[in-house]
Curated annotation (Swiss-Prot):
Domain Radical SAM core: 221-451
Pfam families: Radical_SAM (PF04055), TRAM (PF01938), UPF0004 (PF00919)
Keywords: 4Fe-4S, Cytoplasm, Iron, Iron-sulfur, Metal-binding, S-adenosyl-L-methionine, Transferase, tRNA processing
Keyword Iron among record annotations: yes
TRAM domain ranges (all copies): 454-517
Alphabetized SMART domains for the sequence: Elp3
PANTHER family, per database record: CDK5 REGULATORY SUBUNIT-ASSOCIATED PROTEIN 1, MITOCHONDRIAL TRNA METHYLTHIOTRANSFERASE CDK5RAP1
Protein name in the entry: tRNA-2-methylthio-N(6)-dimethylallyladenosine synthase
Species of provenance: Geobacillus thermodenitrificans (strain NG80-2)
Gene name, Swiss-Prot/TrEMBL: miaB
Domain MTTase N-terminal: 80-198
Length: 523
């Protein structure tokens, strides 16, 4: 859904099909409830619809070049404070930066204490059931604040809001929630807040299909050393276990000139590192109709900008092409760290997951990358206990991990997500077996990580100093180009700077060192 479609559906642009469509949406959700919740709905009621979310139609994605806040909303937040709690991935972190920017443009002030806030938003993650349970627990914890402060607005946004079952559960069990909006319409936050203030009823506005690409959104970035830069939105891969294509919509890329301008501005402001973000970041540009331009082309232009480091996440093996490998091999400010989720080492399981590559194709891609960038640090994601996974298929995952020798991995027990094809499969792997497999995998991950880290002892590495250690304020902490955490003693004036550190001790997940005078040759 884009802005034109939203106006049609809410009645601001009249269409012949609108009244029936809107009534059917309302009746569809109400049919799943035991009470009449229509009194909680407002004129902007747009429920999530997973069936609609799966469609990848030809509706044109609108590019809005300049975000603006209408004059009537300016000052809305004067004398009010906002609090946002963020769950999940870097995309959610970036979305929170945007929402904070909008709040402050409206006149709100930030607070770190939910009890002091006039608006509380939970920016949610839907990737696993555990993440959702945390949000529902937090909603229960926040309920007393609504009693003590009736004017408080409590909202749920992010990926969970795109799920029908979640919205239905909130309508049934958390009726004190004031607003629900999704991932595609963050730029409409001023309108949603206004509606919530004016109606004093629950406001639900979730777009289930295409979103817009909106430029020049205000942002409040955390710190001034590293920055996220969104280069695309959505995912069209539809892996059978994954809810993201439903919650984040179709793939849609920002124009390269807008991205390049943003990175140049960040470099001019003194940022040292940027991370390019996308649910499937190396599908960037595949939706362009007027130019042939991919992530490799974008990286080739960004590497010419005077900024120390450029990363990207998360990539999909299917879209990792030779052009991207060729550009990454030029190095410079393009770091030699690639996150490349494999999910399983079994071709049969990969097929059931809908990953569209085989074990052999993944290993061939790894060989290409290592041939071009011999010292590359590869990290990955792996799911254990997928429906029908046998002991032999799990052993294939272990053997692939040993062959690639990843630097680290995010490992998970399979978590069924309602509305995905895998959720309909017979989940026939007992939980005790899943846990045992996860333990074995994690033991291997730690074994190889320790081996990889040991190689750093005696080496001099470049460290971007981010601040004090979380455990010792007298120790500084920062990250290498390969994303290794380094601790060392030094003056606080080094925070935000690139320094050389000689590694004296390696642990499984951290390195310890001392300031070094030696220069590092960067190819």
């Amino acid at each position: 859904m884009n802005e034109k479609q939203r106006l049609e559906q809410t009645g601001q642009i009249q269409t012949a099909s609108h009244p029936a469509d809107r009534k059917s949406d309302l009746e569809r959700l109400k049919a799943k409830t035991t009470k009449d919740y229509e009194k909680y709905f407002t004129s902007v009621f747009l429920p999530p619809n997973l069936k609609e979310a799966k469609k990848r139609g030809k509706e044109e994605v609108q590019y809005v070049k300049d975000f603006t806040i209408p004059d009537e909303f300016r000052g809305m937040g004067r004398g009010r404070k906002f609090y946002i709690r963020t769950y999940g991935c870097q995309m959610n972190e970036h979305d929170t930066e945007v929402m904070a920017g909008i709040f402050m443009a409206l006149g709100y002030e930030p607070t770190d204490r939910p009890e002091d806030a006039n608006v509380i938003l939970l920016n949610t993650c839907a990737i696993r059931e555990n993440a959702e349970n945390k949000v529902f627990g937090e909603l229960g914890y926040l309920k007393p604040l609504k009693t003590t402060n009736p004017d408080l607005l409590l909202g749920v946004c992010g990926c969970m809001s795109q799920e029908e079952a979640v919205v239905n559960k909130i309508l049934k069990q958390y009726q004190y929630v004031d607003l629900i909006f999704g991932t595609h319409n963050i730029h409409r936050l001023p309108y949603i807040l206004h509606e919530a203030y004016m109606s004093k009823e629950m406001v639900v506005e979730v777009w289930s299909k295409e979103g817009d690409v909106v430029e020049n959104l205000p942002k409040v970035r955390k710190g001034n050393i590293k920055a996220w830069v969104n280069i695309m939105y959505g995912c069209d891969k539809f892996c059978t276990y994954c809810i993201v294509p439903y919650t984040r919509g179709k793939e849609r890329s920002r124009r390269p000139e807008d991205i390049i301008q943003e990175v140049r501005q960040l470099a001019a402001q003194g940022y040292k590192e940027i991370t390019l973000l996308g649910q499937n970041v190396n599908a960037y540009g595949k939706d362009f109709n007027d130019i042939q331009y991919g992530l490799g082309d974008l990286m080739d232009e960004l590497r010419k900008i005077d900024i120390a480091r450029i990363r990207f996440t998360t990539s999909h093996p299917r879209d990792f092409d030779d052009r991207l490998i060729e550009v990454l091999a030029k190095r410079g400010n393009l770091v030699e760290h690639i996150h490349l989720p494999v999910q399983s080492g079994s071709t049969e399981i990969l097929k059931m997951m809908g990953r569209k590559y085989t074990r052999e194709e993944y290993l061939e891609l790894v060989r290409k990358i290592k041939a071009a960038i011999p010292d590359v640090a590869l990290t990955t994601d792996i799911i254990v206990g997928f429906p029908n996974e046998t002991d032999e298929q799990f052993e294939e995952t272990l053997s692939l991990y040993r062959e690639v020798e990843f630097d680290s991995a995010y490992t998970f027990i399979y978590s069924p997500r309602e509305g995905t094809p895998a959720a309909k499969m017979n989940d026939n792997v007992p939980m005790e077996v899943k846990k045992e497999r996860l333990q074995r995998l994690n033991a291997l991950v730690q074994e190889i990580a320790a081996k990889k880290m040991k190689q750093y002892e005696g080496q001099v590495v470049e460290v971007l100093v981010e601040g004090e250690s979380k455990t010792n304020p007298d120790v500084l902490a920062g990250y290498t180009r390969k994303n290794k955490l380094v601790h060392f003693v030094g003056p606080k004036s080094l925070i935000g700077q690139l320094v050389n550190v000689r590694i004296t001790q390696a642990k499984t997940w951290t390195l310890t060192g001392e300031l070094a005078n030696e220069a590092i040759e960067v190819n």
